[in-house]
Amino acid sequence: MTEALYFLDCYMKEFEATVEKVTDDKFVVLDRTVFYPESGGQPSDTGKLVRESDGAEFNVLYVRKFNGDISHEIDGENVSNGLKAGDKVKGFIDWDRRYRHMRMHTATHVIANVIEKEAGAQITGNQLGLDQSRVDFSLEVFDRDKFAEYEKIANDLIAQKSPVNLYLVSRKEAEEKLSRLTTLAKGFSDEIKEVRIVEIEGVTIEACGGTHVKNTEEIKGVKIIKLQNKGKSNRRMYFTLVD
């Protein structure tokens, strides 16, 4: 199983690794990686792998989880001289892309928490993007006028410069001690023995595997740009970052 270096250090930009296997000349599994695989509504990292023996470069186009491994899809430009099991490589992520997603992801936790607490909404999904992100939620009474207030509350929380802590707890601890996580933890597969926690101090505690900033001040601010009624009690909110 690939060691996910991003799990507890989201600020790593480069790393060294060994190729464990290559499938179809383009799907590369490493023993360790900083590349985030698409999951939880967060798009994958992109970047490049550089073979140490000859400096050959391989662009990483997409990253995903597959059968317990983290698979890096590389372009086909160097297929004739492609990566092979045992090759030593250095990996470099597109930091601007990663950092934007980190800010977006932490912002999503903040603004979703505000909607839950202030409106009584139930969050049903999310999708991060570079320019805008969305939060899906269930809410019976959809008072659009109140979302300007929710935006202000979210920005006030962001301005508090709250530390964002990442840590692992046992599945048992998550189920017993963190009431917010009980349902989520019980929904995990039996193989999961530890739960990764994202705690925004004074704001929210979540079970989350994504990448996040260290402090809410890095988000700078959020702006709600669109609200949609998706039928019955299903709602959707789009927001962007204020730079």
UniProtKB/Swiss-Prot annotation:
Tell me a GO biological process for this protein.
alanyl-tRNA aminoacylation
Q: Which cofactor does it need?
A: Zn(2+)
Q: List the disulfide bonds.
A: none
A molecular function annotated in GO for this UniProt entry is: aminoacyl-tRNA deacylase activity
PROSITE patterns for the chain? AA_TRNA_LIGASE_II_ALA (PS50860)
Q: Where does it reside?
A: Cytoplasm
Q: Signal peptide: which range, if any?
A: none
Residues at which Zn(2+) binds: H105, H109, C208, H212
- Name this protein carries in UniProt: Alanyl-tRNA editing protein AlaX-M
Q: Which UniProt keywords apply?
A: Cytoplasm, Metal-binding, Zinc
SUPFAM superfamilies reported for this sequence: ThrRS/AlaRS common domain, Translation proteins
The text of the family note is:
Belongs to the class-II aminoacyl-tRNA synthetase family. Editing domain AlaX-M subfamily.
Q: Which InterPro entries does the entry link to?
A: Ala-tRNA-synth_IIc_core, Ala-tRNA-synth_IIc_N, Alanyl-tRNA_Edit-Domain, Alanyl-tRNA_Editing_Enzymes, Thr/Ala-tRNA-synth_IIc_edit, Transl_B-barrel_sf, tRNA_SAD
Q: What does this protein do?
A: Functions in trans to edit the amino acid moiety from incorrectly charged Ser-tRNA(Ala) or Gly-tRNA(Ala). Has no activity on incorrectly charged Ser-tRNA(Thr), nor on correctly charged Ala-tRNA(Ala) or Ser-tRNA(Ser).
Cofactor note from UniProt? Answer: Binds 1 zinc ion per subunit.
The GO cellular component terms are: cytoplasm
